[in-house]
């Protein structure tokens, strides 16, 4: 018996609490006991990690996380490791006694994600003496050790002889090694397998019934029947391939038009490009010649434009220069006109102001006289008023003093003081210091006499003053007039200067009278001078335009000559238009005819091509439409004969095929129903029994059995008698023979053998004579021989049928071609060649174009000459009337002479205009200038002094009179005399006072009224003086401005200046207009030159490019033509009808064909590449290569042994026959490969029965398992009702659903899925395809339902669910299920693994304290019976008497955490023996 492999130990290196710890594992149960956090789960996690190093699956959670879908970020592994390199290693011994150490190197990855890096490895050939901890650690001293890295471990193991170290990059390779060496029970090929294994371990670890496993027990317990599935898949693949081949043949048969389409599109694609290049080459040659002609024409035009530009530029320069001088002259004329207008306005102002000044001067003189008289009267009134005032004051003083003296005694003293005061004033005024009251009277007379004398002297001086003042005024007036005319001068010179001025004034007045005649004469001469200058300019311009200088005498003769030339050129131009119209009309007619022929030419060419093809196909030459219709009648007769012969051959071929099919039935049964009846009756066909008879014996046995050679041999006829009742589905004659099929012989008949015949004695009264058949078919050898001869005959018939079919098709195609020709081309095929007519008309068109170009050139020259002559006549028409002006050479001198005289006259006119009035005034008073009244000033001084003396004498006389009057105050009389005397005096004084006051009032009134009048007179005088001075000043300013202007302001000056300005403006406008015309013409000429230059450059570039293109295309075209001729495709590519299409139409035709070709050759890499290369427009030869490649490809696609023509289209038609034969063969092959639905159902039923038996065997091992109230555990396997119905229909009712299984569009899997949907319409299939559903239905596991049942207490058999069981019962039941799964995996894997290996069995159980002692004992018993290892963990020792128990205690020593481990073996009668190496604590050492 093969010994089962075992796990020897688990080693943890640098885990949390375990620096270097090796746990020796018991052969049955290893218990880990300890409190919470002691390290039990860490130890199991290390074991699981080494077993399944897949981070996507590992998730170590505590019991509070049970069933959680997510835990901590590191899935519980990162926190169980320490920093640095960590190891988890499993030491195993397999069935071959090979020691294998498998494990993983773990290392924390720095970062927030708390990731762990895992590297699996395996060690083989390690000696038993070497411990795992010695491999991965290096001892530094007694208390220090270092963990080796994986590379160091590899180097260390490489030094050990016979030890193999393997590091794995994939988990699949790691598990593959473990499976091959017997460490795990199942080959884990994929992540799905690893997930199942991990879920099993996880379910074992955490205990209970795992819903993840119970829901998918079929995947865990039932092995995949891959052989059956692969057989189905291979069969379906063969059928699919066969159907695809058939479909491809059908597509090929239906793609005959596609191949024709490929040839047609390839021809269109290449021929269109070929003809386009041919057309372009011809067009490029024509364009190159046209470019060259246009280049020469443009050069001539550019030269003419350049000459024209130089002439216009020169004329424009002259006009620009003339414009500057004209603008200056025009501006000067405008300024002169403005000055003249200004001078005229100034002159008008001066005249107006002079008239105003004369009037003001008269008024001023009159007002001076009035003011002088008023002033004298004012002086008199002032003196009179002053005297009256003094007299009143004196009288008032006297009267007041007298009143005061009368009133009081003191009045005398006041009067005396007043008398003394009056005496003092008199002394002062009269300059008499010795004056006394007594002498006052004498002095009064003296001073009154002096006053009288002064008054008389004043009156005398006043009379003299009046006379002198008149003479002085006349002299000053005359002097001012002379000074105004001549300027400042001495008074003594005034007389002489005045006489000279009067004489000069007479002369100036005479000259001024000549201004107007001179001005009119000058204006006339200037007008003639300007006309002369204009005529000279016109003559110069005419000579310049004519390019020749002409004398004045030659102009009239030239005028007549130009008019004659105009008349002759006009006739030529008018006749040229008619000639040009006739040429153009003929050209248009030719063009229209050519266009009509070009439209007709493609139709004619297509008809000719069709006619040539018909001639080639039938080998006849046709010259008329009647011959074509006659030949068509012959074709119809030939076609009918060929069809009759083809149908006869086809009927014979079908008969041979039916015979071959009948002879090809398995077992020699010619009727399929015989096989079904033989199976039904439990017998064997007689033909099967004699299937191995030799070919030589076949005639004998065929004659021996005769009609009964298709009998069924059954063991007992009596047993099938009942089955014969009501039998209808059978041949008309059914022979049944009783006998043992294994030892059957021919002893049932009595037979006599004759020559090539036998006599069979069926009964005493019935014999049968049968001759040996010439073609026996009894026995496999005879049938095969007959089938072989039939196949040979069938090949001959097929070939003949194909030939006849091809001939018929060829005749039909030819008939169709004739019909198409008659319908489309017969009306034009036998007409004249339009291309020859086009060539003739093109020659005539070229001649017309050349004649038209010559005519246009001549006509243009005549038009130019005509325009030049008309322009010359127009210029002469303006010049001839001015010939007399051109001949007048003294005109300019006369103008200068008159201009000088006019200047003198205008100067005199200005003098007369300025000083004429002064001279007129001076003439009557010039005589007063002879004597100068110089004494007038002295007289005025004497008069003023006399007036002052008279005023002083009057005051002195008045003062002395007052003293005399107060003389009484100096001595008083007595009171009475004083009163009487005073009374008289008072009365007198009062009367005198009244008279004096009245006089004073009158004097005041007169003075006041005369003062107001004097003030009024003075204001008027001041106003007149101010106005006079202002206007005088303005007049002086105007005269100065007029002198500054320097222009003669006469009556005709403005008209002449305006006329001159207008003439210059007209000249300037004409000059500018001509300049603008020249500038526009010059701009147009420059633009034309620039356009011509650009055009010339473009033409040169285009010509060179076109020439290079022509040269390059010539080389490429030669290569294309050489390739075309070498491959013999010129006839197919040179399609003349395409020559009449435009390049765009040909390019469009080629592009459309290219698009169709891309689709057509998409599946052919070679043609696709050649087509892609042919798309290069610069390499036209590649299109030829593609065309040749298409024809070569079509030739290669057709079998060479049946090709009878070089035309691939005809060869494709011949291939139709071969494809038809292949279709028939593949159809028969598909019938042979067809899957029987009944056989499928039988296979699935047998597989289900086998697996049900295997599950029953597994249940026998679980009958004695009990946990708590659970007495037994079993697996219940049932077939689903829907799938059972499907199997029944497949077995018994398949005929009802043959529409699915006989469909060529559905595979068997798809048909099966459709049948399932038809039987179960209530089931939603979701998004799955019928193929997927069918493949699932071919898997027997999908037909089964599995569930776990437990026999619990009084409830009997119940479905195992966690809610119906206690925790311990659920753990035990789940463990039982897991043991079944492991055992099932081992059974499934025996055929994959070596027969000499029994894999390790190990499960886990965490928190085992939830089981009672009986359940624990059951587990121990189950492990012992199944040779399974179990690792359990519990807070305390569960069953230390069995297996191996480890006590784990986590301690902290010097801030270092470690786990203290003590291990004990199971109890025995002897004292318990401590396991080696576990008595000391596992004190961790610091890694160096």
From Swiss-Prot:
Sections of the chain in a coiled coil: 326-418, 444-472, 509-602, 835-923, 977-1116, 1209-1265
Lineage top rank: taxon: Bacteria
Compositionally biased spans, kind Basic and acidic residues: 1051-1065
Single Gene Ontology MF annotation: DNA binding
Keyword DNA-binding set for record: yes
UniProt region (Disordered), positions on chain: 1049-1074
GO biological process, one term: DNA replication
UniProt-listed Gene3D superfamilies: 1.10.287.1490, 1.20.58.850, 3.40.1140.10, Immunoglobulin FC, subunit C, MukB, hinge domain
Places the protein is found: Cytoplasm, Nucleoid
GO terms for cellular component: cytoplasm; nucleoid
Renumbered residue ranges of the record's region Flexible hinge: 666-783
Residues holding ATP: 34-41
Entry keyword set: ATP-binding, Cell cycle, Cell division, Chromosome partition, Coiled coil, Cytoplasm, DNA condensation, DNA-binding, Nucleotide-binding
Reported function: Plays a central role in chromosome condensation, segregation and cell cycle progression. Functions as a homodimer, which is essential for chromosome partition. Involved in negative DNA supercoiling in vivo, and by this means organize and compact chromosomes. May achieve or facilitate chromosome segregation by condensation DNA from both sides of a centrally located replisome during cell division.
Description of how the protein assembles with itself and partners: Homodimerization via its hinge domain. Binds to DNA via its C-terminal region. Interacts, and probably forms a ternary complex, with MukE and MukF via its C-terminal region. The complex formation is stimulated by calcium or magnesium. Interacts with tubulin-related protein FtsZ.
Family to which this protein belongs: Belongs to the SMC family. MukB subfamily.
Domain topic, free-text comment: The hinge domain, which separates the large intramolecular coiled coil regions, allows the homodimerization, forming a V-shaped homodimer.
Name of the protein described by the UniProt record: Chromosome partition protein MukB
Gene field: mukB
